[in-house]
Amino acid sequence: MDMRTKLMAVVAGAAMAFGGTAAAQGTPAPGKVAATKAPAAATRGKTEVTWWGHAAFVIRSPGGAVIAIDPWLSNPKAPKGAAQPEALDAILLTHGHFDHVGEAKALAEKTGAKVYGSFELINLLGLPEAQSVGANAGGTFQVKDVTFHLVEAVHSSSYAADPKSPAQYAGAPVGYVLEIDKGPTLYHAGDTGPFEGMSLIATQFKPSVALLPIGGHFTMGPAEAAQAVRLLKVKSVIPMHYGTFPLLQGTPDALTGELKKLRNTAKVVVPEPGATTAL
């Protein structure tokens, strides 16, 4: 049994532990998107960040852009019965692993949104050309009042259309910096460990909020994430990619403790899955 198959088995077990299968929780199985009421528009003048558990976020800008990042919206931590977005302007993928691609194809088909990611991954998804934007670190794009940049990440990336298919190389992983007009600059790190290039991200883009993995094992844990906060010089951090599987043991409390050791005053913002944070 390869690691991908093992993780899929862990997902099934985790779903049962959280009260049944994904379908029983009111969220669709991977590749399926429930038809639900559209989410409310962003509060006037605010950027709204909704965490769907794991590394999945939906971001609404003051100018009306609605952007999903790594939309595994049926993950075991996903909010029960929450309305999935009916309208999206863009879907951003950090890499090809199933727990990040999630329902990207189904959401793209449903909403008509363009899907952005590494060139190889986008080719593997097989979406219509008009919705496929393959790029790489250094690429810059604009959607309404949001300018976003693909940046480096330190991880691996492969993609399989389903658990029974062999995984294929899906290009280099990336993170995203989102510069929001009349709003904050956000950094979604994707899956990564800390790296010196985070200092360049701080210098070039000056993000104020970082969405960082803290679970460990496949990404950085709390101690490494605290070092990333130091390199990025952000004022706030929203932890992600923790608690979804038993292997992801890092916690927000541990991150807070590690930041205190560094005498770093960045605020740790810990939303519940499904909760929206206004920035």
Curated annotation (Swiss-Prot):
Keywords recorded for this protein, A-Z: Hydrolase
One Pfam assignment: Lactamase_B_2
Protein's UniProt keywords contain Hydrolase: yes
Cell membrane listed as a keyword: no
GO MF assignments: hydrolase activity
Family membership noted in the UniProt record: Belongs to the UPF0173 family.
Name of the protein: UPF0173 metal-dependent hydrolase MXAN_1394
Species for this entry: Myxococcus xanthus (strain DK1622)
